[in-house]
Amino acid sequence: SGAKPLRVSTLRGYEIDIKMFCEYITDPRYPWLSECEARFSVAPRQVFHEDNSIVHVSEYEGDAARRPLTFDEVQALFDAADGLAARIRSRRRKGAVQAIRDAALLKCVYAFGLRRRETVMLDLVDLHRNAKLPHLDRFGALSVRHGKASRGGPSKRRTVLTVPEMEWISETLTHYLEEVRPALSSSSGSSSALWVTERGTRLSRRAANEAFCAARDAAGIDSSLDLHSLRHSYVTHLVEFDYPERFIQEQVGHSFSSTTAIYVGVSNEYRNRLLTRALHTRYGSDFEGAAR
């Protein structure tokens, strides 16, 4: 079909289409069986069976570099990032402050579901209060002013609310702003950028990538993953936290829900939880008895 091989998910989509057509044309409620026998002397039949169907080899079959991380992988990534900073500091080597900044940046990307450019283009003025979450101070919401543009248009803007499951980011950012950012550079106070270098300039996208790769490799996580996988993780985990689809779509700045759906790769545990909930709703106490 070309130089670029088809993805497993694409092939499965083709398979499902053909399988559904075969189910339709072989359905005894319709006259297609007898009509085909009369016209072609042969009856149609289902061509896909368990032994020749594409099997699920993984929970997520999209771009491997951007698959969502599990909760354990996210924790391992953050622990590794913190560990890198601790090791540099214990050896009294240069770069400890930068490593602490990098760990905070990765946590920010995940906690707000940000793209790479959106992250490095954040300014101090983009941190906002949320009247419904006063205890988070100025970390209740985040203004994204450099979102992905559509067809050459201007950058899209959105406000990302801090969800309760991510409230820990307020402590991370407080420590970064009060202790880490001032220690990076004497000129950081004159910069409007949230994420700065030791020269007081805005951190680059490349530096953000390198921060992720260093933590990823230290954590022993799949080396094919890139920084954008944290955004996919955010979407997937909000789904597993039972947030409405429309809310998630607004949080990540997608124009279409179909785009948000591509990001999702929920765990088997979540699927089982949904199934159990549905069975309880449908069968009530009868399901409890059957389960025992």
Predicted regions and their residues:
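C-terminal catalytic core of Y-nucleophile DNA break-rejoin enzymes
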Residues: 150-174, 190-212
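Conserved tyrosine-mediated DNA breakage-rejoining catalytic core shared by Y-recombinases
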Residues: 42, 46, 121-172
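N-terminal core-binding DNA-recognition domain of tyrosine recombinases/integrases
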Residues: 1-62, 84-94
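C-terminal secondary-structure termini that scaffold catalytic or DNA-interacting sites
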Residues: 278-292
